[in-house]
Structures are given as C-alpha cells and as structure tokens.
C-alpha cells in the first residue's frame, strides 16, 4: 500500500512537471488586415514584448479584408475567448466602439494603436508619432525634391482610417505656410489593397498630366504607386513618397522611382502596444496625465484624450535604405 502511495505521488509530480506552463495574461494584437508587412513587423515586436514579460501570450489576429465589419467579428471572437486585453489598429474609429465597449464591460482592457478608436471605445491610444509632425513630414518628403513646386496627390488607405485621415488633415494645414508652392490636387483611397491602390495610382496619373509626386501614407499604397511609376516609365517625372517599410521599398529607392520615404519602427510600435496593454492588465490607470510603461521604449504620458505618441518618423533614402531593409 505504501509503495502504491509513493508511486502515485511520483506520478502526480511527473504529470505536474510535464504539464505546459500556460501564460497568465493573453493580449490580442488586432490588425487592420493580415498579410500586411507593416503589421507582420509589429507582431515581431509584440512577441518580443511577450518574451520579455515572461507571463504573457500575444494572440496575433485580424481580418483578411481591411473593413470594420470584419474587425467586429474578430473582436466578438476574442470576447468569447475571454482574453485579458485587446490592442487594436482600427479600420474605423466609430464602428468598432459598441463591440469594444462590450469587451470593456466584460473586464477586457482595450487600447488602440497606430489607427485609433474613438475615446469611448478604448482606454488609451498609442500614436506611432505626433500627428502634425507626420502630416508635415509626408508633404516635406515631396517638397524637398520639388524646388519649383508643383502638383501632388495623396493615395491613402481607406476613407475611414483614423490615422491616415488625421495625417492628411495635418498635411493640408501645413501647405499654406510651410509649402505654399505645393498644390494638392486630389486625395484618393486604395483601401490598403494592392490592386485597388494600383488602379488609383494609374487614375491619378491619367487625370493630372502635370502631377509631380504621389504621396502615400500607407505601406501598401506607396509600393503600388512606385510600381506603377516604374512600369509606366515615369521615373524622374513622378516621384513617389510617403510611409514605407524599407524591406518592401528598397527596390524603388534603388531604381529612382522614389527619392525618400519615412516611417517609424513598426517592431517598436507592436512592442510598445503590448507593454501598454500589459500595464493596464496589471493595474495601471489610463487617465489624462498618467504615465505608463513602454518597456525599452520608455514611458508614455497621456494627453487629455488619453493618447500619446511613441517617436518621431525616420527618413529612408539612398544613404541608409540598404541598412534598414535588413531590419524591417
């Protein structure tokens, strides 16, 4: 009998030792759409944060199409899974609010990052950079190579994308005083779809024969526009610029379709989003003036809308694109 008890105890210990160690905190990183290099890079940072924290599992998820309706389905599934936090880059600032409010009512911490949710649908928002600075930067990237000024157009993501719309408004506001000889002739939307973005870029070139630059504040649109300029033999005539991943865009800096682009580090952005979400799960407070941890990225101080910015955008050109294309 004693031997049986010893064997039973030994077996129980063996089972406990063999059992997998489950993460205590589950944070969902919800992106606009899967298969987007920017968000894949953000996920790398998110997984880095999870590994650093040790007791966190990151669930990387999102729809296949960049629509609010598809994101709502993802949110509802995460509520059913009873995740601890949702960190979302929103396809629409308002349409997601009811689903995210439901999540918060269930005790799930909710933050938005990259592309924001209306304040009533989240606890805080992490901007990749300061909105006015991004708007000024994307215009400056075109203006720097147009000493005599000229016509430019913007190829954005979806018409409801919170971040792109804010950057475009900031860019427009900067034109009269900072770039008076730059004429913005059109803003079109490619919905972060490469086929539609290609068609919109072709449409701009056809509609505006004096077009000097296409500015795309989206990593999908900027690649599509640069490919169109390359294919139509317009290198040196139409400059493509905007926000781009160096790894995806290097060929267009190399061939001259673009002189320069900018971006923040999406790896850092995903990392910071997970760190902030985890801070809330652990009892951190999201309120104006509060300071929360972004790990190796420092601290985020919230403004009166419970928003904060991570870092300034960084410019990539022939001098550094090779180096950074190997990183992200």
Identify the role of each PLM range.
Residues 17-23:
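Sec/Tat signal peptide C-region and signal peptidase I cleavage site
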Residues 71, 126-152, 166, 194-198, ...:
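Hydrophobic alpha-helical segments within soluble ligand-binding/sensing domains
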Residues 93-133, 140-144, 151, 246-259:
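Flexible loop/hinge segments that line or gate small-molecule binding clefts
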Residues 85-104, 171, 190-252:
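Hydrophobic alpha-helical
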Residues 26-49, 53, 59-73, 83, ...:
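Extracytoplasmic "Venus flytrap"
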Residues 52-64, 151-154, 177-192:
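Short beta-strand elements in bilobed, periplasmic/extracellular small-molecule ligand-binding domains
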Residues 159-163, 181, 276-328:
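Hinge/cleft segment of the Venus flytrap/periplasmic-binding protein
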Residues 38-52, 134-138, 162-182, 196, ...:
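Short, solvent-exposed amphipathic alpha-helices that sit
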